[in-house]
């Protein structure tokens, strides 16, 4: 590895005995513990046997080489994990999912009608709007759905205003609407944004006929399309099977006995490659020399190929590593969002 001076370190240590083999806890996607280049360096839990019993009484059955925190009792493993933003959106969906912003005013569609919304917990609502919304495709898809209702309301308002201005005009044009309904300089609403959207649609369809554009913006099919888009987004990003496969409460750090001992996951190639950089036999022709040929790899699975690890899994994996003598703990990449309470679990574990 460039910059690490590993070869020089081995020269310096030549002739010296290793007092204890360091344990490197690799927290990530899993590894192939039977890989010929790694199996001599796989950590073994000396207090555990592969006999279907929890021999060391730590709550994890047959954790001989580590543990999988995204696995189920039946041997299944979650195929992917959601991003933290999606998990947080689903946590707040019933409170804020149907809230949209119009300038300085927020509206809620919780009752099926547009009503002014005032949050009971301003700090929580600001966290949702400023942090969760930006990191959630689901939140944005749902907001778009409700914004279609807002744009329809504005379109009806524009129609009313332009017809009041030109009561006797037979054919109203989009240009008429833009002229009459343009927002003032002090207007903080999304009136101008809706008008701009109307212009874009009119230009795309190469028409200046207000009646045809009006029908597009108030059509019921727009609302149906918005719901279908949200449903497609949810199907892709909104359910990673945690409840069905793992079955724990991911928001309860005390609900800690879950998972399985499956370390060879569908995404284990990533971890196997990383492990091969860290440990293994040196001097083998055709292979790169690893950093530490005497180290052992403890495998802790918290992540699949897609998404971001659950912070509860991360915290428990760190605690597992410490409790079982890890000298070094390697974490996966940072999450995009750290909810305050769950962040505290991580801090306490570290």
Predicted regions and their residues:
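Short coil-to-helix leader/linker segments, especially the first N-terminal amphipathic alpha-helix
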Residues: 1-10
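Subtilisin-like serine protease catalytic core
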Residues: 9-24, 29-310, 324
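Aromatic/hydrophobic pocket-lining residues that form the small-molecule binding cavity
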Residues: 314
